Amino acid sequence: MKLKRIFAALLAGAALLALVGCGTSGSTGKPSSSAASTPKDYTQILHDARSAEDNEYYMIFTKGADGKYTAQYGYSKDYEADQLNDEIANMMMPMLNLEDGMAEDFAASLSTMMVQSYGLAIVKPAEGRTQDVVDALNAYVESEQQSMEHYLEDQYQIAKNAKVETLPSGEVVLVCCEDSDTVLVNLKKALAA
């Protein structure tokens, strides 16, 4: 019986030491810095920055944890997962000129119809690849401008007003849509938070 009590006391002491070891010295009760490094939900940020009509018509795509492309909103619900992955990999990513290894994280939305200039993207560049991302998105804008210049005047004006900016938070954003100034302001506010 005495041996059981000693054993129980040793277990209780070990548990107490384990709990004390879980604390951090100098803890202030404030969130740790890992909370500040929590990844941002770029898909949700794009969704919230644009109009309800755009959310209805244009999907927002990104790369899933499994390495395959995935999408939400717009017409994405009409696709099977493999079809969606193939369309994004073979059509949309080449339109944005984003290659593997350029982005640590991203979300984007594009029109693949040749009668509309529409492209939004938030890209967190991979280490040392910021200028590559800026160049890729600027090439997208230039392509849109060339496509629309002698075709559809209203869409050409949208492409001419497109913006590619590197934000203080490190993300590179592309805004090529109607009311681009408002969308850009919305993106900047959300990404600064």
Q: Residue spans of the language-model regions?
A:
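Bacterial N-terminal signal peptides that target proteins for export
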Residues: 1-10
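C-terminal motif of bacterial Sec signal peptides marking the signal peptidase cleavage site
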Residues: 17-21
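Bacterial signal peptide processing site
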Residues: 23-26
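Early exported N-terminus immediately downstream of N-terminal targeting peptides
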Residues: 36-91, 97-100
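Extracytoplasmic/secreted envelope proteins and their assembly/folding machinery
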Residues: 39, 43-46, 120, 130, ...
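Mid-length scaffold segments of soluble, non-membrane domains
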Residues: 93-139, 145
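A short, solvent-exposed beta-edge/loop patch
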Residues: 112-113, 122-124, 155-193
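Short Gly/Thr-rich strand-loop-strand
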Residues: 130-168
